[in-house]
Amino acid sequence: MNDYLEIIDVVARQILDSRCFPTVEVEVYLEDGTMGRAAVPSGASTGMYEAVELRDGDKDKYLGKGVLTAVQNVNDTIAEALIGCNVFDQPYIDKMLIELDGTNNKGKLGANAILGVSLAVANAAANALGLSLYKYVGGVNAKVLPVPMMNIINGGSHADNSVDLQEFMIMPVGATSFTEALRMCAEVYHTLKNTLKDKGYATGLGDEGGFAPNLKSNAEAIDVIIEAITKAGYKAGEDMFIAIDAASSEYYKDGKYVLENEGKTLTSAEMVDFFEDWVNKYPIISIEDGMAEEDWDGWKLLNERLGKKVQLVGDDLFVTNTERLEKGIEIGAANSILIKLNQIGTLTETLNAIEMANRAGYTAVISHRSGETEDTTISDLVVAVNAGQIKTGAPARSERVAKYNQLLRIEEELEDVAEYRGKKAFFNIKK
């Protein structure tokens, strides 16, 4: 096997994401004629500690959301540094990209520029070897297909409705394969649409393909999902569990949690009580961002009360950053990390965060963003690292479905080697 292949060109362009905002797409060309491509996602609710996504700010073009500066940074500064490098030396290339930027948040060149290049390099290397990306990144032991954490009711920043919490999801832990898991979720999704219609609710979709009805309360979102699970022929708490992304930083104001649509203002301790009541009442297996990104004491209390029963996922809390993750591990905040490639900005740093989480006994959930493209890198990544869980929206809208279809292909390619761990994917809890 050739272990040295030069990069001969790097080309970036501005494309559109699923929310009709510009994003960066990068192509890396190799001396043997191989090309690798990657497109960068973008978030709606973003953590304050995320790597910086460079936007042009020109209000006359795409409402200031253009990314031509990031594109130019790739085509000029980054391309000049990358041409002649060995495509198979991913750690070196990622280190060089970080040093080329020179800031601690990738604010000079832009995390969207840097990530696009990092992922395009990995794709080019895999293509040159004739390997699937998951095999190139994960090696021969890459074999675990993920339990989907499927967002089927959208609220918060992902929808214009009366639901405070951002995402209500289903997890088909009772399936025996990813193929079966996807079918189960699709059946519940269609049943939920009919259930909402029967109740007189609108069935318009949010950013991630979930329904965005004007429900009477946050709890009604869970009630109607459980009803749909039952009507679809499955058992809530056995075949399927509920997962929640509270995105609580979005309604954390002056040290309090303001649930406007319920007319409640809660302290950290009261917010923990709120979730504990839900966990005792409903078949909830995972809560993401239950507390705000700055409320470390609240996170610690939440973990003390619920950490043995429920997966507690840090998204805004950790932003895929090893420094923040290390602090969380030290003080006992959360027991899981959400992994978003564009929060940190390179493939190598992402893999480092996953490794640190696993060493500490944390699960890692590989995630999309609300602004997505047809890029399927995260589908390969979740199998490459045997994470066992993926969060990539509803089984609707092609930018979400593309990820699920890629996982079907991977499961087919792995054949008998493929593993679907179901409830065993939650090795961090005893429920």
Curated annotation (Swiss-Prot):
It is found in: Cytoplasm; Secreted; Cell surface. (2R)-2-phosphoglycerate binds at Q166, K340, R369, S370, K391. Keywords: Cytoplasm, Glycolysis, Lyase, Magnesium, Metal-binding, Secreted. Binds a second Mg(2+) ion via substrate during catalysis. Its main location: cytoplasm. It is an enzyme of class 4 (lyase). One of its GO terms (molecular function) is phosphopyruvate hydratase activity. It comes from the Bacteria. GO terms for cellular component: cell surface; extracellular region; phosphopyruvate hydratase complex. Transmembrane segments: none annotated. Its EC number is 4.2.1.11. Pathway: Carbohydrate degradation; glycolysis; pyruvate from D-glyceraldehyde 3-phosphate: step 4/5. Its cofactor is Mg(2+). Mg(2+) binds at D245, E288, D315. One of its GO terms (biological process) is glycolytic process. The active site is at E208, K340. InterPro entries: Enolase, Enolase-like_C_sf, Enolase-like_N, Enolase_C, Enolase_CS, Enolase_N. It catalyses: (2R)-2-phosphoglycerate = phosphoenolpyruvate + H2O. Disulfide bonds: none annotated. NCBIfam families: eno. Belongs to the enolase family. Catalyzes the reversible conversion of 2-phosphoglycerate (2-PG) into phosphoenolpyruvate (PEP). It is essential for the degradation of carbohydrates via glycolysis. This is Enolase. The gene is eno.
